[in-house]
Amino acid sequence: MTQWYPASPALWQGRDDSIEAPDARRLFQTVTRSETFSPENWQQKIALMGFACDEGVKRNAGRPGAAGAPDALRKALANMASHQGHERLVDLGNWVAPTPDLEGAQQALRDAVSRCLRAGMRTLVLGGGHETAFGHGAGVLDAFAQESVGIINLDAHLDLRQTDRATSGTPFRQLAQLCDAQSRAFHYACFGVSRAANTQALWREAQWRNVTVVEDLDCHDALAQMAQFIDKVDKIYLTIDLDVLPVWEMPAVSAPAALGVPLIQVLRLIEPVCRSGKLQAADLVEFNPRFDDDGAAARVAARLGWQIAHWWR
């Protein structure tokens, strides 16, 4: 059974510059850490949650280790300067998945996300492998059952695989099937896709599902496509697989990208999403601290989370 644990206070430590000025604060000083999972107490705040699971990565024959990412990313966030928006972050702990019960873990995350959103919070989830996306996305769909939900994925992979069980490569096929079962439209856009990393069968599935696909080669000029997708939906779930970044910026993932989309381009793409007023949920997935020898990759990933919280409207 998937267990919930509050985040350790030892994770939220950093340099104290408060002697300089009242507003010389860092995230470890402004993030609220909750000892209970009680989203009803935190309306209008951003629920920061960890999904400590890489069972889907293992099933997908990837490099395990992403289960350790949530706490590693908290440590990287802790010492970053606190600016507008960061005071809204409430750390609602980690969902820890026992091997091999991926399906139970995804259901626990789904229920937690739905509860947060129904309580008036927004969710920022630190994965975990990209199996995080099915639990997170399903929770968003549950919370906004009467509205159109757009899924924006920044990823080298379409993650529309067809297998006999859930993996880190199947979350968007699972979400598409969930939409089918609920007789609702499946709105999915994937930016940063590597044609070299996706078979023709996956491209055919994306075409059949009317997925908006922007290749890694074209992301430098994709703001119009992003704006068009934002305009056609009521609510947005943003998921960032860190393997969308080039290997020289993000080596610490299961499948590093030979080409990838540079961090500055990723930030330019997500800014209008964050400022749209439609973003309800976001996550960072696939970070693997086992392959981050000096902590530099954690800081890259944390900067994305920092920027999302800062821009979120």
Curated annotation (Swiss-Prot):
Name of protein: Formimidoylglutamase
Gene Ontology BP terms: L-histidine catabolic process to glutamate and formamide; L-histidine catabolic process to glutamate and formate; putrescine biosynthetic process from arginine, via agmatine
Catalytic activity field: N-formimidoyl-L-glutamate + H2O = formamide + L-glutamate
Pathway given in the UniProt record: Amino-acid degradation; L-histidine degradation into L-glutamate; L-glutamate from N-formimidoyl-L-glutamate (hydrolase route): step 1/1
Binding-site residues for Mn(2+) 2, renumbered to this chain: 155, 157, 241, 243
Gene3D superfamilies recorded: Ureohydrolase domain
Obligatory cofactor(s): Mn(2+)
Record: residues binding Mn(2+) 1: 130, 155, 159, 241
EC number: 3.5.3.8
HAMAP family per UniProt: Formimidoylglutam (MF_00737)
Gene: hutG
Family membership: Belongs to the arginase family.
Alphabetic keyword roster: Histidine metabolism, Hydrolase, Manganese, Metal-binding
Class of the enzyme per the UniProt entry, highest EC level: hydrolase
Signal sequence range: none
Free-text cofactor note: Binds 2 manganese ions per subunit.
Protein's UniProt keywords contain NAD: no
Source species of the chain: Salmonella agona (strain SL483)
Keyword Metal-binding in annotation: yes
Lineage of the species this protein comes from: Bacteria, Pseudomonadati, Pseudomonadota, Gammaproteobacteria, Enterobacterales
Gene Ontology molecular function terms on file: agmatinase activity; formimidoylglutamase activity; manganese ion binding
